[in-house]
């Protein structure tokens, strides 16, 4: 499971011209589900993302998490994070989980954030073309992989 985590002042997502999710200060999370991912991957990434200390404290040091500041999350599914571009010029998405499995794990990821941490969150729409507007704060962008590839 892969995530691109961006610290944002504001972020929202539109589907077919309609706003379906919006947050203020917090994290924009683009989430890709890999074939073979499961509950352990969800647990690892949710815990890592919610407790990642990338918000500034009173001294300007990155020392606070989204949980510490009472921030929000916008979680958007993005299978293209699993694209392999090592050969040729067209990404290969063979490592991405099937849509059925990816949707199930995506929903479990969202539920875990809400249930275990009680954070306010919004989501995109699975398997839909989305327009995402992100107002980066910093910018601060972190790449995470549950298999700890980077």
UniProtKB/Swiss-Prot annotation:
One of its GO terms (cellular component) is cytoplasm. It is an enzyme of class 3 (hydrolase). A motif (Gly-cisPro motif, important for rejection of L-amino acids) lies at residues 138-139. It holds the Pfam family Tyr_Deacylase. It is found in: Cytoplasm. This is D-aminoacyl-tRNA deacylase. Its main location: cytoplasm. InterPro entries: Daa-tRNA_deacyls_DTD, DTD-like_sf. It catalyses: glycyl-tRNA(Ala) + H2O = tRNA(Ala) + glycine + H(+); a D-aminoacyl-tRNA + H2O = a tRNA + a D-alpha-amino acid + H(+). GO terms for molecular function: D-tyrosyl-tRNA(Tyr) deacylase activity; Gly-tRNA(Ala) deacylase activity; Ser(Gly)-tRNA(Ala) hydrolase activity; tRNA binding. GO terms for biological process: D-amino acid catabolic process. The keyword Magnesium does not apply. The gene is dtd. Keywords: Cytoplasm, Hydrolase, RNA-binding, tRNA-binding. Coiled coil: none annotated.
């Amino acid at each position: 499971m892969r995530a691109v985590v961006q610290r944002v002042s504001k972020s929202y997502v539109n589907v077919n011209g309609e706003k379906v999710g919006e947050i203020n200060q917090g994290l924009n999370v683009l989430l890709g589900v890999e074939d073979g991912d499961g509950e352990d991957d969800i647990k690892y990434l949710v815990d890592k993302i919610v407790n990642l200390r990338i918000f500034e404290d009173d001294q300007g040091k990155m020392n606070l998490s989204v949980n510490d500041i009472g921030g929000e999350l916008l979680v958007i599914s993005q299978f293209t994070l699993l694209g392999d571009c090592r050969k040729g010029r067209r990404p290969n998405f063979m490592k991405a989980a099937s849509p059925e499995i990816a949707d199930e794990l995506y929903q479990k990821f969202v539920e875990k954030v809400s249930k275990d941490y009680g954070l306010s969150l919004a989501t995109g729409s699975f398997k839909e073309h989305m327009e995402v507007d992100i107002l980066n704060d910093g910018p601060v962008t972190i790449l995470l992989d549950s298999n700890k590839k980077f």
